[in-house]
Amino acid sequence: SSGSAVNRFWQLPQSYEELVKRREAITAWAELTYGYLGRSPDHVGSCLAGMVMGIDVFENHSPQRARALLDYYEYVRDRDLFVTYVIANPRSDHSKAVGQQEEDQFLIAAISDEDSEGITIKGAKMLGTSAVIADEVLVATGQPLRAGEEMYAFCAAVPMNAKGLKILPRKSYEAAAVSQFDNPLSTNLDENDAVLFFDEVKV
């Protein structure tokens, strides 16, 4: 819509031919990394493009939120930003629901405050694949919630350098690799999954 050239994975295909070109571009990404990067930049980019393709679903729920989604898509598309996502919840007791974790109501990322300027997020989310090299993170909930758990029901886009956002990555495979000759994959293709902790992050 901007008239500028952008990465093919941001494309919203309108024909079979455009869909084929998009698929060929994503195939090229996978071939470049031998299929070892499960969360390369085209992954969440394609997710956002898919949401925009179905923007009418969002408009039926909230025209304002739909506009915000479209604006965000255009923002990251035009800057070709690497967006990761976190949708899984850390739980100390897997037999209990999200809102029944006894240790701390903010073990899982939740809205701790809300005002006219936005929301404040506190708590952790997983599993931020490539978070250490991403530009932005899409924070959402990927599991059903119960009545009374509304504080956990949100979706937000956050810059990875946001004040209060802490990245807790696993150890890098590359750091332990002996050499590129001995470890050709781990020296080049490490996504570094991470737990993200939101310490009163304002959105």
Model regions: which residues?
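FAD-binding core of flavoproteins
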Residues: 85, 90-203
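Internal helix-loop-helix
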Residues: 2-83, 130-131
